[in-house]
């Protein structure tokens, strides 16, 4: 047997000649790149041409409108994601509404006669829809025009009704319809209004089947618009299964919430997963899915798994009223309960500190081991770096006593390079570079 192992030159050749092969197993000396692939699970409309439960890679929100329906939550989540990261590697899998689901509804009733020209504006889920008002127009006339404008807009509701009443119905069934904020402004037109918030939505779609369809592919970030207990549990179970020591396709899940601190921390306490992070934007008018989509896109843009995400802006979210801004005690409590606060700084919505929902060990002991979401992302990257180095260096080597020191050497080299990457960053930061 030859002392040098060849992959393509048999050792039994007796014909004289010069036989040369290339071996690139030792070519890679550095650490692997860390591009982030994002999977978005989102509700679609029947008008969409993409079959439900079939993932598709997207590059613009215009594609999402065609594939999943204009004004669907999938469409608007894709728009929000690309607004925060135009270079996003995004795959979307659309899901149909639950067969037992109920659509949320809201009403806006105008009254009076316009005494001056102006604009009536309605904001639905953070999207503004407006119509001009002329002097002398009745409330019913303006309401009809407003319904037409809403129907034509990229919003997650439809408009109907008679007379001066406008009935808004969520396009998607489930509790997600209740998350649409609703505000109305009649300006100085002389018209008045009465508005009732979205209520009645029940039974969100189930993401478990959609996740099972993509279980064999590696996505680094999975974004879900549903923050209800059942779907959060399904997301947690899926991520645990694909990220374990056998499958080794490490990923994190991203959720969003706009509820009160008490409601949000109760939800994260039930999740308690070091691989799931939930952005909390108190009092937001956007649905939770829009918050999650922007947060996931910002996470994906930061390829350094250990770099903190503090102060990064999430675009596309309306600035909440001052009364909704959380106090220091609320933010601190949120961070102690697995909730990532989003705060308004200089008229921009920013991440305060990105944490996971994990706070308690299996025996209910306080455990900050996976506090920051960067911790599990870093561990995933270290595992992948070691695994890829071994796979590159020793793809078909026989397990022997001579091989083990080589494997150890390669692993140590990877770990040293990882440490050097952190040390170099620290030295540059200390030098003000």
Language model region names:
Residues 129-137, 225, 396-400:
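Second-shell loop/turn segments in exported
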Residues 1-89, 303-433:
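Structured, hydrophobic secondary-structure cores that serve as assembly/anchoring elements
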Residues 145, 149-153, 238, 242, ...:
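Conserved short hydrophobic interaction patches
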Residues 80-98, 161, 171-309:
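Extracellular Cys-Trp
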Residues 101-114, 206-211:
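Disulfide-bonded cysteine-rich modules in secreted/extracellular proteins
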Residues 112-124, 185-205, 214, 313-337:
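Bacterial flagellar/type III secretion structural subunits and associated motility module proteins
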Residues 60-66, 111-181:
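Extended, beta-strand-rich, solvent-exposed assembly scaffolds of outer structural proteins
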Residues 140-143, 147, 208-211, 236, ...:
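Extracytoplasmic/secreted envelope proteins and their assembly/folding machinery
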């Amino acid at each position: 047997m030859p002392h040098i192992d060849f992959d393509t030159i048999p050792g039994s050749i007796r014909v004289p000649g010069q036989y040369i092969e290339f071996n690139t197993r030792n070519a890679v000396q550095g650490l692997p790149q860390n591009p982030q692939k994002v999977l978005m699970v989102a509700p679609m409309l029947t008008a969409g041409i993409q079959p439900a439960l079939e993932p598709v890679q997207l590059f613009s929100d215009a594609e999402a409108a065609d594939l999943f329906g204009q004004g669907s939550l999938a469409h608007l989540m894709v728009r929000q994601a690309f607004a925060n990261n135009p270079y996003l590697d995004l795959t979307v899998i659309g899901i149909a509404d639950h067969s037992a689901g109920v659509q949320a509804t809201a009403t806006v009733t105008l009254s009076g006669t316009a005494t001056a020209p102006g604009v009536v504006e309605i904001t639905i889920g953070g999207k503004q829809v407006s119509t001009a008002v002329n002097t002398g127009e009745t409330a019913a006339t303006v309401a009809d025009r407003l319904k037409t404008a809403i129907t034509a807009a990229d919003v997650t509701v439809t408009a109907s009704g008679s007379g001066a009443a406008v009935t808004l119905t969520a396009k998607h069934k489930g509790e997600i319809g209740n998350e649409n904020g609703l505000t109305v402004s009649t300006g100085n037109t002389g018209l008045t209004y009465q508005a009732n918030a979205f209520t009645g939505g029940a039974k969100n779609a189930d993401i478990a089947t959609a996740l099972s369809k993509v279980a064999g592919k590696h996505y680094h970030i999975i974004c879900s618009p549903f923050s209800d207990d059942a779907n959060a549990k399904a997301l947690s179970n899926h991520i645990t299964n694909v990220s374990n020591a056998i499958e080794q396709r490490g990923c994190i899940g991203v959720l969003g919430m706009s509820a009160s601190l008490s409601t949000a921390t109760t939800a994260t306490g039930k999740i308690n997963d070091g691989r799931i992070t939930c952005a909390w934007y108190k009092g937001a008018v956007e649905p939770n899915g829009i918050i999650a989509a922007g947060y996931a896109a910002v996470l994906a843009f930061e390829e350094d798994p250990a770099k903190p995400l503090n102060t990064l802006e999430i675009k596309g979210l309306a600035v909440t009223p001052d009364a909704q801004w959380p106090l220091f005690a609320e933010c601190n409590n949120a961070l102690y309960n697995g909730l990532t606060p989003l705060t308004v700084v200089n008229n921009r919505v920013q991440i305060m500190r990105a944490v996971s929902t994990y706070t308690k060990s299996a025996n209910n002991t306080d455990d900050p081991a996976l506090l920051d979401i960067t911790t599990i992302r870093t561990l995933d990257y270290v595992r992948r770096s070691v695994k890829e180095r071994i796979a590159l260096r020793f793809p078909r080597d026989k397990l022997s006593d001579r091989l083990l020191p080589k494997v150890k050497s390669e692993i140590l080299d990877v770990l040293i390079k990882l440490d050097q990457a952190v040390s170099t960053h620290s030295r540059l930061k200390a030098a003000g570079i």
